[in-house]
UniProtKB/Swiss-Prot annotation:
Binding locations of Ca(2+): D614, N616, T618, Q620, E625
Coiled-coil portions: 706-783, 1050-1103
Native source species: Candida glabrata (strain ATCC 2001 / BCRC 20586 / JCM 3761 / NBRC 0622 / NRRL Y-65 / CBS 138)
UniProt-annotated stretches for the region Disordered: 1-33, 52-114, 668-737, 971-1374
Task of the protein: Component of the PAN1 actin cytoskeleton-regulatory complex required for the internalization of endosomes during actin-coupled endocytosis. The complex links the site of endocytosis to the cell membrane-associated actin cytoskeleton. Mediates uptake of external molecules and vacuolar degradation of plasma membrane proteins. Plays a role in the proper organization of the cell membrane-associated actin cytoskeleton and promotes its destabilization.
Bias-annotated ranges (Basic and acidic residues): 708-737, 971-1012, 1063-1102, 1169-1185
EF-hand domain sequence ranges: 239-274, 601-636
Descriptive protein name: Actin cytoskeleton-regulatory complex protein PAN1
GO CC list: actin cortical patch; actin cytoskeleton-regulatory complex; endosome membrane; nucleus; plasma membrane
Length: 1374
């Protein structure tokens, strides 16, 4: 067995065969006992070198000096190990040789050999070989160890040291020189995690320098550089503060006031560019922006994914440690969490043994495997191999008895390994039973046995100094000297895991590959997933059943830590939220989803995250919900699964508060309901003093809540009653208000009646004013009328003139403003009245100017920020100047108006004959219309026009014409008729006056238009004359209808259109009067029949017809010829169009008489008709002798119109029947019966007297006006030679409309005309015609009757056979 071991060692490492037992036992320990050095078995010098190199770890203050980095390479130490099998790779040397250190002799190798991760594979061989010696050799060793234990060793470190106080033990670094290294001397924050991302806009060397500089100035625990620290560096560049400020604006992309590494690198890059002569860009290019932003995103992801280190004692168990925490053997080991023993080395590396490739054994907690002979370093198993002892594991013993707890704390100096080292227990509770404590810190040669190939147990072997020997009998089962260590076979066997969990507790099987570097106290990753951290364990106080394999390998193994959002995450997420929320407090779904989408997660994960975040299902996220969503997103990116339901630790606090409030409200409401309904028994309302005490107490205990609830309910009911009472009171007030409003509404609804009364009163007042004005107008007769007229015209034109002046001035002002705007297009656009600039306009322009100035600053252009202000001021001044000029012009115009009023007021007083009390203000108000309402102004202007066109021409007329209207008006006022009749009369008069201004009527206008369409412009003068005569209905209007006014009639159509509105109103009033006229029509029809009979009798007198001219015959034939004329209206119209000018030119005398509407008095004097009879008929027609409603008072109307047609009727009475055709040219008597003597024409006297004819004939045109309207053109259709009968028929019907038609052919021709047909034919149709004519006898002509007449006259296409007149040419079809 021993030879096999040696052969194995020689085969492995190639060393010459030797006897390690003798060297190790006799010479090794005996020589080193007085010197307290390790055994010298031919490997003394290397061991001494190793110990000398490790002297720095003896004293407590030197514990961190020899911290070794993780970059050790085991192959670098192998030459030393191959020099001798007995070289103990000591990591904790004794203090007797302080001169030799690892850094002096082998600096690089010692750094590598002292690392926790990469320990030499030969370390455990010493212990393993020592375990193979015979018991007598072990006794010798124990003796030597006991001798060496005289001089105790000092406590020494057995673990790995991450940070040492002496920089000499750190890896050598280049000397700090230059700007960057000057800051690096202050220390670098190597814990800062910066992603390995290459920035393309700087070189790799610059990026490395900037990273070093960044690490030197960054604050501990932060990944950003504050503005103050960054300013201290940037100011050393020597640039101007303005340039540095611009560089900061470009670099601080997040506007956080702090710089991350990519931003800091960008700032340094920009500074270098400026120092090299480049300019600072106004904006970063897109590539640089994208690189910096992606770098920042990577940093944020790393910040979120990185968990804080060493926050809890369990963190070391959760994650594999790259470097171990230093542990002193004199301090309390981590027995409360993991393994009870301290590490006696670093992470164990598999080392070659003399008998086989054994796996490294972990001999401590988090430390490296170290031998337990000198300095607790691992011993090689080749030759005198000492078994490596794991302090803190569970040893396997067949006795299945629990191990006793080994003390590793203070004051346990049973074992010393080179000084006063604390005792380390190598055993703990195990299913194998109690094992005696084994000291690893002294020179006590404990003996441990390890099984060999033949399964023979080996005596325990000491791993430390000279201590009391352990029992070497084979009765004790081999004990593992480490934690979870499998028994190792020291010769020819498969390498066993010396730091693994024993098979007895976990069932781990040995494997052939090397162990991974691991620390004692952390379970190796061979039995469970390395990514799953261990839970906290108590290894020294029992309950070791938690080490059961099911706890680690079972599916129930999971992380127990709660998932929470750290403060760093919250600050980062809140900053992102505030960036996008725009101070609204919430983030809409579109923005939040877009932020989540940038993570690259799939749709299902994002939907699940959104459902978890949007707790209230509002479609938007608040700050805490957004932070929760980002946490879940980053958790998913880091590999964590998305929970189906939020754990309580992730539920936002706001949601918790709301849920608690909801639950409280629900519970309180449910309790209240339950109390109110569950205690509705008799006891709730009964107070029985005889109840027993327990019941009484129960009542006292239970009822207060119900009583309080009842009181609260009563209070609530009282409040409800009060509210109901208030509500009723409010409703009552509302009803009262509504009722009051209804009353007002009813009053308003009755307003139409009141309005009617008011309108009637207003109309009455207007009438009185008009009459008073007429009286005043004729009071002062000393002033010529033409002067009055001129003055009135000027005054009436003043209002219109001033209005036009104001309008023109306003237009000029607006045009100037518009011109000013076009001249300055860049000026501020004014939105105020008249294009003025308001404060809002200035504010908008100022914001635009500010934006423009910023753009100019960015683009390097000049700053013209003051130009908009200057432009706005100049534009405003120009507008104000224009407005002031306009106001000044208006003031001048006002002064002119006041001057005119001051001059015109006394003139008006003189003209009216009143005292000069009219002031200029009153004159402006009542003459010009300043300050009056529109209706009042219109009435004043209408009154003035009436004075101009009515009162003044009346002075020019005869006194007879002037006397009639005032007398009629006075008579009406004297009679005291009711107000309605006065209003109707006044309306009728106003209508007559307005129509009289143009000398036409509405009906005549339409006839004129139809005649113009048919005539092609012939006889324009005669038609207006006829219209004037026919439209005149008062003596005042008859004066206006003189031939001098015939020019005005040409524009009658346009003026009448302006009066349509007033006519419409008057029509409505006249329609009411038509109903009253129906009774009178019947009476008038009877009178007409009687007159027709009288006319037939008069036809029997030939002498009268012969003595009278053709005019008499024509007038007498009109009533008889009306039915006959109906057969030829169209043909006669055609001849009328062509022959009318001829008839006008032929007879000058007859034309004069015909055109003179006031020639009728001469005709009346020459007529043989009974005057008294005619007067009586006239009175009957006028309604003076009948019960009239007042309508008959417009004598002027009936006086003028009837006289036109009646002249034909009297002609029928006084003339012979064979002379009807002659009357076509004599319709001159149609004019109203105004006594204007014009008897120059000899033939005209034949016409009957106008007074007598007018009443009888007036009814005829009124009744037969419809038919007459259709035949109004027939009077002009007769030829020069003849056609008197048909012309007479037309004239009789048309007399009422066109007085100038009286132009007739010579009288001699009339005598030759055959007599008209007998009258009996006319008796039947005449009443119908009279009915229609009566309908049209109203002041306003009815167009329906006109068209009906035309239709009736249209079929008549031939003249009567009895006439003997040659038929006229046929009319064209219309």
């Amino acid at each position: 067995m021993y030879q096999y071991s040696n052969q194995t060692g020689n085969g492995v490492y190639g060393n010459p065969p030797m006897q390690p037992l003798q060297n190790y036992g006799s010479s090794g320990y005996q020589q080193t006992a007085p010197m307290q050095q390790p055994l010298q078995t031919g490997y003394q010098q290397p061991m001494q070198q190793t110990m000398n190199q490790n002297q720095g770890m003896q004293l407590p203050q030197q514990q961190y000096q020899q911290q070794q980095p993780l970059q050790q390479q085991p192959m670098q130490q192998q030459p030393m190990q191959q020099q001798s099998f007995q070289q103990p790779q000591l990591q904790q040397p004794l203090q007797q040789q302080p001169t030799q250190t690892g850094m002096q002799q082998q600096p690089l190798q010692q750094q590598l050999t002292q690392s926790g991760m990469l320990q030499q594979p030969l370390q455990p061989q010493m212990q393993q070989s020592s375990q193979t010696i015979q018991p007598n050799q072990l006794n010798v060793q124990n003796t030597v160890q006991s001798q060496q234990s005289v001089q105790p060793l000092l406590p020494q470190q057995t673990g790995f040291y991450r940070q040492g106080n002496q920089p000499v033990l750190e890896p050598l670094k280049p000397t700090a020189t230059g700007f960057v290294n000057s800051f690096a001397n202050n220390g670098l924050d190597n814990n800062l995690k910066i992603p390995a991302i290459r920035l393309s806009f700087i070189t790799a060397q610059d990026q490395a320098k900037f990273e070093t500089l960044f690490r030197s100035i960054v604050t501990k625990g932060s990944n950003t550089v504050s503005g103050e620290n960054c300013r201290a560096i940037l100011m050393k560049s020597g640039l101007q503060p303005s340039q540095l400020a611009r560089i900061w604006q470009l670099s601080d992309t997040n506007r956080a006031g702090e710089l991350l590494f990519p931003e800091f690198a960008l700032a340094m890059h920009l500074i270098n560019n400026v120092l090299q002569g480049d300019s600072i860009p106004y904006e970063l290019d897109s590539k640089t922006k994208n690189e910096v932003s992606s770098f920042i995103d990577a940093i944020n992801l790393s910040v979120v994914s990185t968990e804080s280190d060493f926050k809890t004692p369990f963190d070391d168990l959760f994650k594999p440690q790259q470097s171990l925490q230093p542990q002193g053997t004199g301090f309390l080991p981590q027995t409360s969490f993991g393994l009870p023993a301290q590490p006696t080395g670093g992470f164990g590396q598999p080392q070659p043994t003399t008998f086989g490739q054994l796996q490294a054994q972990v001999t401590g907690g988090f430390g490296q495997p170290q031998p337990t002979t000198f300095g607790l370093q691992p011993q090689t198993t080749g030759g005198f191999v000492q078994a490596q002892q794991v302090t803190g594991g569970i040893a396997q013993q067949p006795s299945m008895n629990p191990l006793t707890q080994q003390g590793t704390g203070f004051a346990q100096n049973q074992q010393g390994t080179g000084g006063f080292l604390q005792q380390q227990g190598t055993g703990s509770f195990n299913n194998a039973g109690f094992v005696q404590p084994q000291n690893t810190g002294s020179f006590v040669p404990q003996q441990q046995q390890q099984p060999v190939v033949q399964s023979q147990p080996i005596a325990p072997q000491s791993t430390g100094g000279f201590g009391p020997p352990m029992p070497t009998t084979f009765g004790i089962q081999p004990q593992s000297t480490g934690g979870f260590v499998q028994p190792q076979v020291t010769g020819g066997l498969q390498p066993a895991l010396t730091g693994n969990i024993p098979q007895t507790s976990f069932g781990a099987q040995p494997f052939n590959q090397q162990l991974q570097p691991q620390a004692t106290g952390y379970l190796p990753p061979s039995q469970f997933s390395a990514t799953m951290p261990l839970t906290a364990q108590k290894t020294g106080f029992g309950n070791n059943e938690i080490y059961a394999q099911s706890n680690f390998n079972g599916p129930s193994f999971s992380t127990q830590e709660s998932d929470i959002i750290t403060s760093e995450e919250k600050s980062l997420f809140y900053k992102i939220f505030e960036t996008f929320s725009q101070n609204r407090g919430v983030l809409d779904s579109a923005t939040a989803v877009e932020i989540f989408r940038k993570s690259g997660l799939n749709r299902s994960d994002l939907e699940k995250i959104w459902n978890l975040c949007d707790i209230n299902n509002t479609g938007q996220l608040n700050k805490q919900e957004f932070a929760l969503g980002m946490h879940l997103v980053y958790g998913r990116l880091n590999g964590r699964s998305i929970p189906d339901r939020l754990p309580p630790s992730l539920i936002p606090s706001s949601t918790k508060i709301l849920d608690n409030v909801k639950n409280q409200l629900i519970s309180s409401s449910s309790d209240g309901n339950r109390k109110s309904f569950t205690r509705m028994d008799a006891l709730s309302y009964k107070n029985d003093d005889n109840d027993k005490l327990p019941n009484f107490r129960n009542r006292r205990k239970n009822y207060p809540t119900d009583n309080d609830a009842d009181k609260e309910r009563q209070r609530r009911q009282e409040r409800e009653r009060e509210e109901a009472a208030k509500k009723k009171e409010q409703e009552r007030k509302t009803k009262m208000d509504i009722e009051r409003a209804r009353k007002q509404g009813s009053f308003t609804n009755s307003e139409p009646e009141f309005t009617d009364v008011s309108v009637s009163e207003i109309e009455d007042i207007k009438r009185r004013i008009t009459e008073a004005q007429q009286k005043l107008a004729v009071r002062n007769q000393s002033i010529p009328n033409d002067l009055k007229k001129r003055f009135n015209e000027v005054v009436a034109r003043l209002p219109t003139l001033f209005v036009e002046i104001y309008k023109v001035d306003t237009e000029i002002m607006q045009a100037r403003i518009e011109l000013c705007k076009r001249r300055t297009p860049s000026s501020i656009i004014g939105t105020g009245p008249g294009g003025s600039i308001t404060e809002d306009d200035r504010r908008k322009a100022k914001s635009k100017a500010l934006l423009r100035s910023r753009m100019n600053a960015l683009t390097g252009k000049g700053d013209n920020s003051d130009e908009p202000d200057i432009e706005s001021e100049s534009f405003t001044k120009e507008i104000e100047k224009i407005q002031s000029e306009s106001a000044q012009n208006k003031k001048i115009i006002k002064d002119i108006r006041i001057s005119i009023s001051e001059l015109s007021a006394p003139i008006r007083s003189i003209m009216t004959g009143s005292l000069p009390t009219c002031s200029s203000t009153d004159f402006e108000k009542w003459e010009i219309g300043v300050g009056l309402e529109n209706d009042v102004r219109e009435f004043v202007l209408t009154l003035k026009k009436g004075l101009l066109y009515v009162s003044e021409p009346s002075h020019m007329n005869s006194n007879q014409t002037l006397s009639h209207p005032p007398a009629a008006a006075l008579k009406k006022e004297a009679t005291g008729e009711d107000r309605a009749a006065q209003l109707k009369e006044q309306a009728q008069k106003r209508m007559k006056e307005r129509l009289a201004k143009f000398g036409i009527s509405r009906r005549e206008t339409r006839d004129l238009e139809s005649s113009k369409q048919q005539e092609s412009g012939s006889t324009p003068d005669a038609v207006p004359a006829a219209q004037t005569a026919n439209a005149s209905q008062t003596p005042f209007e008859e004066v206006i209808s003189s031939p001098q006014k015939m020019e005005v009639t040409s524009t009658a159509g346009e003026d009448n259109e302006e009066e349509d509105e007033e006519e419409r109103k008057l029509k409505e009033q006249l329609e009411l009067l038509k109903q009253k006229k129906n009774a009178e029509k019947e009476k008038r029809l009877a009178d007409l029949r009687r007159q027709i009979e009288e006319a037939e009798k008069e036809e029997e007198h030939p002498s009268v017809a012969q003595s009278n001219s053709g005019n008499v015959q024509s007038s007498s034939n009109q009533p008889a010829s009306v039915p006959v004329a109906n057969s030829q209206p169209q043909n006669l119209q055609n001849t009328h169009i062509t022959t009318k000018p001829l008839s006008l030119n032929q007879t000058g005398s007859s034309y004069d008489m015909a055109s003179n509407t006031y020639f009728k008095p001469t005709q009346t004097s020459q007529s043989a008709f009974d005057r008294e009879k005619a007067e009586q008929q006239r009175k009957i027609q006028r309604g003076l002798e009948s019960d009239d409603d007042g309508w008959s008072d417009d004598d002027d109307d009936l006086y003028s119109k009837p006289n036109t047609a009646p002249q034909t009727a009297p002609v029928l009475d006084s003339s012979n029947t064979p002379q009807p055709g002659m009357n076509a040219s004599v319709p001159a008597p149609i004019a109203p019966p105004i006594p204007t003597p014009q008897a120059s024409s000899p033939a005209v006297p034949v016409a009957p007297p106008i007074p007598a004819v007018t009443p009888s004939e007036s009814s005829i045109p009124m009744t037969s006006n419809a038919d007459v309207a259709g035949a109004d053109h027939l009077d002009q259709d007769t030829d020069i030679s003849g056609a008197a009968a048909s012309a007479d028929k037309q004239n009789t019907s048309h007399v009422s409309h066109i007085p100038p038609v009286p132009v007739a052919p010579p009288l001699p021709q009339v005598s030759s005309i055959a007599p008209p047909p007998p009258l009996p034919n006319l008796s039947v149709p005449q009443p119908h015609e009279t009915v229609d004519n009566d309908d049209g006898s109203d002041v306003l002509s009815i167009p329906d009757s006109v068209e009906s007449d035309k239709e009736d006259l249209a079929p008549a296409g031939h003249t009567p056979a009895a006439m003997g007149i040659p038929p006229p040419p046929p009319l064209p079809n219309f």
